[in-house]
Amino acid sequence: MTKPPPFPEPDDSETADERQFFAQQKTRKLDTVATLGGTGEAHYHGHRDRLRARYREQGDAALADYDILELILFRLIPRRDTKPIAKELLARFGTLSGVFGAPQHLLQEVKGVGEAVALDLKLIATAAQRTLKSELRNKQVLSSWSAVIDYCHAAMAHETKEQFRILFLDKRNALIADEVQQQGTIDHTPVYPREVVKRALELSATALILAHNHPSGDPTPSRADIEMTKLIAEAAKPLGITVHDHVIIGKDGHVSMKGLRLF
């Protein structure tokens, strides 16, 4: 009977290579467990649970702005530590209002914010604006002035170009329509009084509130703002249409031209 050939003796260099390979795999596994906090979960999962519990038990007063933004980002970016992203967004845009009001392309310039996340943030901003706008429906707008300002600020304060908006009111001063009449450049919006009055007649509006933003952040009215407002008021008056106010929106405040008696 023929004996099988003996197994070759392992080469010392091959044995050393195998030991090194398996040692590296063990080290990598230990590093992964350490990164996951020794529990098989990423270290930020425990932080997320604690943050949610704090909000559930104590409400928003217990959270900083970056905590609130981080809670939102948890859902949008489930497999990543979102605290640095939340802090970077606030550093870039200043406030929660600034983050949600920022244009999509600027949001995407922040590391970790892709197109889908930017769109979701804008969707949240849209929901907030519509909520504020719904507060104006079927109400006398002049008796809900703070709601008007809140809505205009949410809709316009962080636009990067000037935007001229008109709130059309009926004889009860209830909101009929809210329309952006014109969009312009960073410091100018062309507005045509005849077109404003024409649209008011089409909607059977009897009163208007004019609003536009100053992307510079300073809501001080310019000479052109004052002259344009006077022209609209003069064109509307003979047709029984009242211009209640022209509000200029800045990032941190607003100016009522009626309050300053500028027209």
Swiss-Prot record:
Domain of life: Bacteria
Gene Ontology MF terms in the entry: metal ion binding; metallopeptidase activity
Binding site for Zn(2+): 212, 214, 225
Entries under InterPro entries matching the protein: MPN, RadC_JAB, RuvA_2-like, UPF0758, UPF0758_CS
UniProt keyword annotations, A-Z: Hydrolase, Metal-binding, Metalloprotease, Protease, Zinc
Ranges where the MPN domain occurs: 141-263
Biological process terms in GO annotation: proteolysis
Keyword Glycosyltransferase set for record: no
Motif JAMM motif: positions: 212-225
Pfam annotation, one family: RadC
Family to which this protein belongs: Belongs to the UPF0758 family.
NCBIfam families xref list: PRK00024.1, radc
UniProt-recorded name of the protein: UPF0758 protein NGR_c13970
Organism name: Sinorhizobium fredii (strain NBRC 101917 / NGR234)
